[in-house]
């Protein structure tokens, strides 16, 4: 039997400081349909900045 396709989708979190740094994660599209914004550490500038969701190419 084939497995059902999951609700989780892989996303990329890109730094708003324009350093080029990003994190990859996944999120449940059903529970969180809006774009994710989260404050995380950017090691390039050594500060906490807002990371915004982008599609993985």
UniProtKB/Swiss-Prot annotation:
Superkingdom, taxonomy of origin: Bacteria
Xref: SUPFAM superfamilies: Zn-binding ribosomal proteins
Protein name: Large ribosomal subunit protein bL33
Species this chain originates from: Shewanella amazonensis (strain ATCC BAA-1098 / SB2B)
InterPro entries cross-referenced by the UniProt entry: Ribosomal_bL33, Ribosomal_bL33_CS, Ribosomal_bL33_sf, Ribosomal_zn-bd
Gene Ontology MF, one: structural constituent of ribosome
UniProt record similarity statement: Belongs to the bacterial ribosomal protein bL33 family.
GO cellular component, one term: cytosolic large ribosomal subunit
Keywords in alphabetical order: Ribonucleoprotein, Ribosomal protein
Encoding gene, per UniProt annotation: rpmG
An annotated GO BP: translation
């Amino acid at each position: 039997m084939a497995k059902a396709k999951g609700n989780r989708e892989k996303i990329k979190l890109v730094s708003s400081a324009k350093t080029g740094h990003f994190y990859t994660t996944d999120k449940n599209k059903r529970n969180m349909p809006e774009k994710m914004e989260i404050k995380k550490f950017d090691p390039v500038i050594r500060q906490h900045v807002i990371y915004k969701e982008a599609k993985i190419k």
